[in-house]
């Protein structure tokens, strides 16, 4: 297996909270898989960063955010409805001001 792509993203917690305050559950339903939707806002922000990092690593902008499911604990990403070669490894973290994630796509 070789590294085929790397993506990284950072999300401002305050900006994420503002988007949620404006759009509420509609925002959550559009960007998160059903099993993710009940998570705390800080965890959702971290998963949003992870989904963005996965899109960057795979270089496939057509994948919907909702179809990128971050494993729990966040180690591997799955793409619902789309088969990808290899695996996408994910590491995420969040603290008071920011959430950050990196994704590494590994394939033959």
Curated annotation (Swiss-Prot):
One of its GO terms (molecular function) is magnesium ion binding. Its cofactor is Mg(2+). GO terms for cellular component: cytoplasm. Keywords: Cytoplasm, Fatty acid biosynthesis, Fatty acid metabolism, Lipid biosynthesis, Lipid metabolism, Magnesium, Metal-binding, Transferase. Its EC number is 2.7.8.7. Its main location: cytoplasm. Pfam families: ACPS. One of its GO terms (biological process) is fatty acid biosynthetic process. Disulfide bonds: none annotated. It comes from the Bacteria. It is found in: Cytoplasm. It is an enzyme of class 2 (transferase). Mg(2+) binds at residues 9, 52. InterPro entries: 4-PPantetheinyl_Trfase_dom, 4-PPantetheinyl_Trfase_dom_sf, ACPS. It catalyses: apo-[ACP] + CoA = holo-[ACP] + adenosine 3',5'-bisphosphate + H(+). Belongs to the P-Pant transferase superfamily. AcpS family. Transfers the 4'-phosphopantetheine moiety from coenzyme A to a Ser of acyl-carrier-protein. This is Holo-[acyl-carrier-protein] synthase. The gene is acpS.
């Amino acid at each position: 297996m070789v590294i085929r792509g790397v993506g990284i993203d950072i999300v401002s917690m305050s900006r994420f909270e503002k988007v949620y305050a404006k759009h509420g559950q509609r925002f959550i339903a559009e960007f998160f898989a059903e099993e993710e939707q009940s998570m705390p806002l800080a965890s959702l922000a971290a998963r949003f960063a992870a989904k963005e990092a996965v899109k960057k690593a795979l270089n496939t902008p057509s994948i919907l955010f909702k179809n990128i499911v971050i494993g729990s604990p966040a180690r591997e990403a799955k793409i619902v409805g789309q088969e990808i070669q290899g695996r996408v490894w994910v590491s995420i973290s969040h603290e008071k001001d920011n959430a950050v994630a990196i994704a590494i796509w590994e394939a033959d």
